Design a protein with these regions (language model features):
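N-terminal loops that bind phosphate or other acidic moieties
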Residues: 2-5, 12, 16, 20-375
């Protein structure tokens, strides 16, 4: 069982070549262009087996649909989602200077160190589900080069203040997407069959709310929530900040919108969704920020939607709207609003149970039980 990245805890953070000037492991365009369709034959075989198991048809409810969905995603009538990989992307946001969060921007770097020490909620949940956890610094204001075990794949030191400037340049948003692609490729190379995406970045609910409004046409009032727990006065201020960001314009494409309003870790999660879908790897989506990142990925490649499973419904105001935009039905609703991939990690055992049920339950014929489907 491991809750730390693969780097040795006694060595400094591992540093990848700059994504702006090095050969890419996989180019963004190749991942967008090679997302496969769902395997309908694998779904058919899984569904037929589900109906032959020693239970009334459909009696395991959404677990049965989940099992069939995972078969279609993976192309295997008896799918597996173990081992899981949890990837937490961390970056700072210039919009934190607008006082939109209950916590100072310095908390991003402090939480990255906490992840590396194994002390955060996601570390606990990763240990519980025996998942590999990797923390990637894609743009923390203070580089994590002295934090053992953190992967450095930095694009820049924090995003721009979206209230008055773009978050990133077009090249930087592409580089951040490719950070996510590389992270998923590392996870798959290590054997991961399911990817859970998490994030850390003070003020990232502000950027996510702006992105959601831009993608859906909703107003700031409709998408903005309390994030880390802000009071009414700061909530009203946060809405005004997002309205200012939206007034600058959002561009014509999903890449333009990410560059204008997004965040480095949000773009990295979107890239991770692209890479996972390209490799037939299910993505267990976490809360509000992760769902907005997933929405961004589907605006670049609609086929990504087929590979998304929604772990939970967050308590953040805009999450319901983000789920609605994706037609997502979350597995859990626990009033969570932490991020880090925590809610998705809590939902992961449901995916594992769906797979185990499909492969390990006896059929009516095997068990000698009457009442099964006719031959």
């Amino acid at each position: 069982m491991r809750d730390q990245p693969s780097s040795s805890s006694s060595t400094p953070a591992s540093t990848l070549d700059s994504p702006l000037d090095s050969p890419l492991v996989s180019t963004l365009s190749s991942n967008i262009g090679r997302i496969p369709s769902l395997d309908l034959e694998a779904r058919r075989q899984a569904s037929a087996r589900l109906d032959s198991l020693t239970k009334p048809p459909g009696s395991l409810g959404r677990l049965e649909k989940l099992a069939a969905d995972l078969a279609a995603m993976t192309g295997d009538p008896l799918p597996r989602v173990d081992p899981a990989a949890i990837i937490v992307f961390a970056a700072d946001h210039g919009v934190a200077a607008e006082d939109v969060s209950a916590f100072p921007a310095s908390v991003t770097a402090q939480m990255v160190a906490n992840f590396a020490r194994g002390g955060a909620a996601i570390n606990v949940f990763a240990r519980q589900i025996n998942a590999r956890l990797e923390v990637v610094d894609v743009g923390v204001a203070t580089p994590s080069d002295q934090v053992p075990g953190v992967v450095l794949d930095r694009v820049r030191a924090g995003s721009g203040n979206i209230a008055c400037e773009d978050a990133m340049s077009p090249d930087e948003v592409k580089a951040a997407l490719e950070v996510g692609i590389r992270a998923v490729e590392r996870a798959r190379a290590a054997g991961a069959r399911c990817v859970i995406l998490g994030e850390m970045g003070i003020a990232n609910t502000t950027a996510s709310s702006a992105l959601l409004a831009a993608f859906t046409g909703l107003s700031a009032e409709e998408v903005v929530g309390r994030g880390t727990g802000i009071d009414d006065a700061r909530l009203d201020h946060k809405r005004k900040v997002i309205a200012r960001a939206l007034a600058r314009g959002t561009g014509d494409t999903a890449l333009d919108t990410l560059a204008s309003l997004g965040g480095l870790e949000i773009a990295a999660m979107a890239g991770a969704c692209l890479a996972a879908a390209a490799g037939r790897t299910p993505v267990l989506v976490d809360g509000f920020i992760a769902t907005v990142a997933a929405l961004a990925s589907t605006r670049m490649a609609p086929g990504v939607r087929d590979y998304l499973v929604f772990g939970h419904r967050s308590d953040e105001a805009g999450h319901g709207e983000a789920l609605a935009a994706l037609g997502g039905e979350p597995l859990l609703s626990l009033g969570l609003r932490l991020g880090e991939g925590s809610g998705a990690a809590l939902a992961y055992p449901l995916l594992a149970s769906a797979c185990a049920m499909l492969s390990e339950m006896a059929t009516f014929a095997d068990a000698g039980v009457e009442g099964g489907p006719s031959a």
